[in-house]
């Protein structure tokens, strides 16, 4: 289904143009700059003056209100507009993109086929879709990526180089897996925020201040995640390690299981997946 990305071994950065300058675009740009990408390799097209000034403050000089030759001929063109904007933001690029430009879309719900139609692209291998998540904003993201079989190794390497700047990259076997990874890691941060929010609320009910309860919940989640990353043991075994027979943790875990938490999580993830599929159909 998916494969963790391996070191791509590129020594130079491609030229990268962005259509859209929202949070995810800024996250990728920030990650690229931290990775040593020259500011001159990056250009951005955004409609608002405030966003252009923000990007200028990041060191990006090539920030414009409309696409030009840099965008049409970039090695990578990153589409980072909102789904409802594709009908107006993409047609100005139609039939002007260089055949050598690889299009990387971070737009949720818009299929490669739809993008190809909007951009006037005949080779679907020119388009790569990805689904980052919000921890990408601090370089701790997970990004699922899918490209057609005709997308060559050089293009895949450039895409990996860009996305590794914001976290871990997984290549997906099918475009349909974009819906699956949306349900797990794309929407996943909100699931953990909800659990931390609920745990914090329980702490407040026990008498802790909101500040202390929030810190306890967040640090516990962070510590558990880091332990899971560094330990060779499975998640189930790590849980068992904390759950002494007849102890306090076992009582809590049993309450979760009896309350249907595992099934509820599966149901929630499936609901996210189905909504992702629906959005793709609505935007087709």
Q: Which residues does each predicted region cover?
A:
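Short pre-catalytic strand/loop immediately N-terminal to key active-site residues, enriched for Gly-Thr
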Residues: 16, 128, 177-183, 235-240
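Catalytic, metal-anchored helix/loop core of enzyme active sites in primary metabolism
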Residues: 182-184, 196, 282
